[in-house]
Regions:
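Short alpha-helical segments and helix-capping/turn motifs at coil-helix boundaries
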Residues: 34-39
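Short coil/turn segments that connect the beta-strands within blades of beta-propeller domains
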Residues: 46-48
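Short beta-strand segments at enzyme active-site cores
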Residues: 51-52, 88
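Short, conserved, GDST-rich strand-edge loop motifs in beta-rich repeat architectures
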Residues: 52-70
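Extracytoplasmic/lumenal domain signature
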Residues: 1-31, 65-102
Length: 105
């Protein structure tokens, strides 16, 4: 039965205590507004995975206020579709400032 109930959440900007939070230096994870998934995701129903193309974090062309590699920005992230747990990730650009958003996953 589909109820619309939220099953899980994956933070593309890792929160305190989450894997990758330390790549957002000087607590920039707290005030960086976005590292969204605005393009098409892909799914592998046989494996039960979903693939997220995560965009450049705000502000696209200036990264001085968000030091560090900024994981999971500008990455392909593979999640378990049932649990939302990260299976693997590949960060295409570390600390992106050129708006090289992945077009799809």
């Amino acid at each position: 039965m589909r109820t619309g109930k939220l099953l899980w959440t994956f933070h593309t900007i890792p929160q305190a205590g989450e894997f990758g939070n330390d790549t957002w230096e000087e607590n920039s994870w707290q005030y960086t507004g976005n590292a969204g998934v605005w393009s098409m995701m892909s799914a592998d129903p046989d494996l039960g995975y979903v693939y997220l193309p995560v965009e450049t974090p705000t502000h696209d062309f200036y990264g001085g206020q968000r030091k560090g590699d900024n994981l999971f920005a500008e990455s392909i992230v593979c999640l378990n579709a049932r649990t939302g747990e990260r299976v693997w990730h590949f960060q295409i650009v570390h600390h992106g400032v050129w708006d090289y958003d992945p077009p799809a996953a």
